[in-house]
Amino acid sequence: MPDLLLELFSEEIPARMQAKAADDLRRMVTDKLVAEGLVYEGAKAFATPRRLALTVHGIPARQPDLKTERRGPKMGAPDAAVQGFLKATGLKSLDEAKIQRDPKGDFYIALIEKPGRDAIDVLAEILPVIIRTFPWPKSMRWGARSGKPGSLNWVRPLHAITATFGLETEEPDVVKFAVDGIEAGQTTYGHRFLAPAAINVRRFEDYEAKLLDAKVVLDPERRKDAILTDAKQLAFAQGFDLVEDQNLLDEVAGLVEWPVVLMGSFEEEFLATPAEVIRATIRNNQKCFVVSDAKTGKLANKFILVANIEATDGGKTIIAGNERVIRARLSDAKFFYETDLKTKLEDRLPKFEQIVFHEELGTQAARITRIERLAAEIAPLVGADVAKTARAAHLAKADLLTEVVGEFPEVQGLMGKYYALAQGEDASVAAACEEHYKPQGPADRVPTDPVSVAVALADKLDTLVGFWAIDEKPTGSKDPYALRRAALGVIRLIAENTLRLSLMKVAASALAGLSVKPADVQKLPGDLLTFFADRLKVQLREQGARHDLVDAVFALGGQDDLLMIVRRVDALGKFLESDDGKNLLAGTKRASNILSIEEKKDKRTFDGAPDAALYSLGEEKALAKAISEVQAEASASVAKEDFAAAMSAMAKLRPPVDAFFDKVRVNDDDPKVRENRLKLLNEIRSATRAVADFSKIQD
């Protein structure tokens, strides 16, 4: 079947827009094809700085013919309705219509046959629409046509459109259409400087190969691989290791069509500036990679740049230009750093009085005071020194007002650590200045120093409680204050440091420090706990655990010790994987279902202890005895936080429960016996609630 080749050739597309633009082009074209009945076999899109390209293969040469029925008016309807029906369906007279028998009357039915069109004609119709409605985040108009109504908007001036369609074994046809005076053809262009001449192309394989000959690597993944491989080899040859940076690699691959890797250097005196600042300076300003000494691992005074040209002088001029700019930028960074060192962190804090954190939650200064108080309260719970924790919380945000962080926000916290160490603060205090922001994502490291943990928890819990208090909660996909990330951070801090904390108590303490109070003060900690439960389900699901087990544990009530919840969920999951667990779950659910039906029927519950005198069968007596023993054993194990032992105790219920359902008829003819047996079923449900609410567990 025929293939489509489409290229949109323009001035340089911003690197950050290229990946989404390629995906949008693929999606828009293929969606339209499918909507037109042209189901394709495969599609792939590409982007370089100067072009978007798409290949769609296995497109049918022609649309299928369509046959549809359209229902018209009833027989005997007014002439106006009949004439409207004939006009709408293209029928010459009612003789061409069918009659459909219906209980409501007999109706005219038009059989409409719509012959399929050639795929190339469909493409000529849909491609201009796609180009004109392309969803660029920012676009422009240009040239003489820009002032005319309906002129094309594109991210950068669009120069040429290549569009061919045909079988692999035949000469393809040009898809004939024009957009804003730009006619589609078979001509593209190579590298702007190395091979700018026009190139005639036929289909994708021919197109990609000719572009490569014209110094254009079409596939961004190939460009990334080439940059990474060449950069590593160049660094290795000089005795260095490349400091890899995936985000920078993605960006640089969008800046070049023909990547050429070169190495430059800067003066060693700049290495006195923190390595992270040097890296941020070189990355942000010149889009260059840094390297480290292969022996010591320390940052070296070299950098790797990626040019878009094979220079006749071997790249000397390009290197010199980059060195000149980097030298100036590093000089600025060094000045910022040295200026910052002249002012102590605590001396910066008064300025926070003029900085509003949130209009309802007060200034940054007020927030720092809250975090300091809360961190000091949390410190004994996590084994941290109270004085060091309070000091760390006091200084943790101070680096936000430094020159370096103002220039490079990504090093906030890290610079706080460097400045704290420079002014002689304790190592734990300095570490907390950096680590209190962590973890900032699922792959981010979790702090282990108790002081860092205490300040990190206080920072995140103050944020969560504060925004809960003013009813600024996440909704759907909107989470402007990153509260979901903060909650996951709290969960990871607790779980990975095996901390015992009552979230309800800590949340209440955080709430007490707020000047603003919610309408229902008592409700807030519980609402926040529900939010943590939802986040914990997300966390455990990503780790392969079942989210319904989290519901089963939280349903017990009073569960706000996340570490114990995680351990209980783990033990419950292992138990339910065993035959005893599966069968006990089935028995418990059967008991719950029977109880639900009978409670609804009788409009009452069957609470209270069964009457042993009414037991007439051995299976009843055996089950009652087993429940009594298991309840005592499981409760004792839970009290000792030995959840595995509690599950083992639960397993002892399986045989008597199975026997009871095999031999005993619950709904006995004697009302008293029936009631007693239903109470015994309720005892099964109550016994299992020592570890979880089994009714919340999915089969």
From Swiss-Prot:
It is found in: Cytoplasm. Its EC number is 6.1.1.14. It holds the Pfam family DALR_1. It catalyses: tRNA(Gly) + glycine + ATP = glycyl-tRNA(Gly) + AMP + diphosphate. Coiled coil: none annotated. One of its GO terms (cellular component) is cytosol. HAMAP family: Gly_tRNA_synth_beta (MF_00255). Belongs to the class-II aminoacyl-tRNA synthetase family. Tetramer of two alpha and two beta subunits. NCBIfam families: glyS. This is Glycine--tRNA ligase beta subunit. It comes from Bradyrhizobium diazoefficiens (strain JCM 10833 / BCRC 13528 / IAM 13628 / NBRC 14792 / USDA 110).
